[in-house]
């Protein structure tokens, strides 16, 4: 028998290890290169391959478990395979990536106290803007990923293939859209394509309003929303790197780790709050868990499921549009880098 305490300990250790790996990995792009256009390529590659990895893991896990005996030992073996593969990829990253950003003025700089570092971080207005964008990107996946299964089961009365088909369709369109964004970033800029993408995502969700009980309209909405959100997914990590340079320019303090860590915390908190709000709203509407043996839901719960799926993505698109409306860092970046180059040549951050 496995105790609840043992399971909790395992989860804590796993999450600590994940955080210890993910934060340095996330900030690595700002330490590898300072050219914004090159960071754009890294961001596109990272965000384009990430959903593919999720699809591979999701589609291959159960077949592998069945192939290896379909018992507890089979699950352990399959998880071990994924762990070894992940370790191999991390080692590849470790040996092949090089931190080429070396700033002599930074080596001479004394370590600053934590309050000073936090004050500089909180005074960086673009940190808040990009953290909000990173958070809503994460929340958008939480909303659709949480509500869509309920929608397919209770509104479309299908808990077999519809959710998988919609999820796969939206994910594949998102991946293709992310890679298509690479030349668009170079021509139009990160902010501009993400800003237009927000309107496309908004339009796709409004399209769904025309007939929220039609599977065809659901497919069109998923495809349009994925096209609209692809630009933000493509550029968000490159934007975080730009924020690092802006922070150094504004405060004479370079904060790669703190900026990426702060953004990461925002996404985790945002996704957690979104899940809690969704759960709370469903409970308040009278939703009854299927584990209780009840397959029918009260009308209020069905209306809540429809409302959450209708208005959640609308809110996400609105936040993206409003945030990017005042985002001017793309225009400022060349002048910022020129001034930083001159300051660093004189031994200043």
Annotate the PLM regions.
Residues 82, 165-174:
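Transmembrane alpha-helical segments of major facilitator superfamily
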Residues 9-10, 209-222:
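Helix-loop junctions at membrane interfaces in 12-TM secondary transporters
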Residues 9, 21, 25-149, 153-154, ...:
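Intracellular loop-helix junctions on the cytosolic face of multi-pass helical membrane proteins
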Residues 43-62, 262-282:
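Glycine-rich segments within core transmembrane alpha-helices of 12-TM secondary carriers
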Residues 1-13:
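Single conserved hydrophobic/aromatic residue that forms the stacking wall/gate
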Residues 55, 171-179, 272:
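Residue-level signature of mid-helix packing/kink "hotspots" within the transmembrane helices
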Residues 192-207:
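Structural signature of the two symmetry-related core transmembrane helices
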Residues 176-190:
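Helix-to-loop junctions at the C-terminal end of transmembrane segments
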């Amino acid at each position: 028998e496995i105790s609840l305490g043992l399971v909790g300990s395992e989860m804590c250790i796993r999450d600590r290890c994940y955080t210890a790996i993910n934060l340095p990995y996330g900030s690595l792009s700002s330490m590898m290169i300072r050219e914004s256009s090159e960071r754009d390529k890294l961001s596109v590659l990272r965000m384009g391959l990430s959903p593919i990895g999720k699809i591979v893991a999701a589609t291959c896990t159960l077949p592998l478990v069945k192939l290896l005996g379909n018992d507890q030992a089979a699950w352990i073996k399959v998880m071990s395979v994924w762990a070894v593969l992940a370790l191999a990829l991390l080692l590849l990253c470790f040996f092949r990536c090089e931190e080429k950003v070396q700033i002599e003025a930074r080596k001479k700089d004394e370590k600053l106290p934590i309050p000073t570092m936090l004050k500089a971080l909180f005074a960086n207005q673009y940190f808040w803007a990009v953290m909000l964008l990173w958070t809503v990107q994460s929340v958008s996946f939480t909303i659709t990923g949480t509500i869509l299964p309920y929608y397919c089961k209770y509104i479309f009365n299908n808990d077999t293939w519809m959710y998988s088909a919609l999820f796969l369709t939206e994910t594949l369109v998102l991946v293709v859209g992310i890679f298509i964004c690479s030349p668009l970033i170079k021509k139009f800029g990160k902010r501009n394509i993400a800003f237009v993408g927000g309107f496309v995502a908004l339009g796709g969700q409004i399209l769904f309003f025309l007939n929220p009980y039609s599977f065809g309209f659901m497919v069109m909405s998923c495809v349009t929303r994925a096209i609209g959100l692809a630009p933000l997914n493509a550029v968000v990590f490159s934007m975080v790197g730009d924020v690092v340079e802006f922070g150094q320019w504004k405060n004479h303090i370079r904060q790669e780790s703190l900026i990426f860590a702060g953004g990461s915390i925002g996404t985790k908190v945002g996704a957690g709050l979104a899940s809690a709000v969704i759960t709370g709203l469903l409970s308040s509407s009278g939703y009854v868990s299927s584990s209780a043996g009840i397959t029918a839901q009260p009308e209020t719960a069905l209306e809540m499921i429809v409302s959450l799926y209708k208005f959640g993505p609308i809110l996400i698109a609105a936040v993206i549009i409003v945030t990017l409306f005042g985002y001017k860092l793309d225009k400022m970046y060349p002048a910022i880098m020129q001034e930083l180059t001159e300051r660093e040549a004189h031994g200043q951050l």
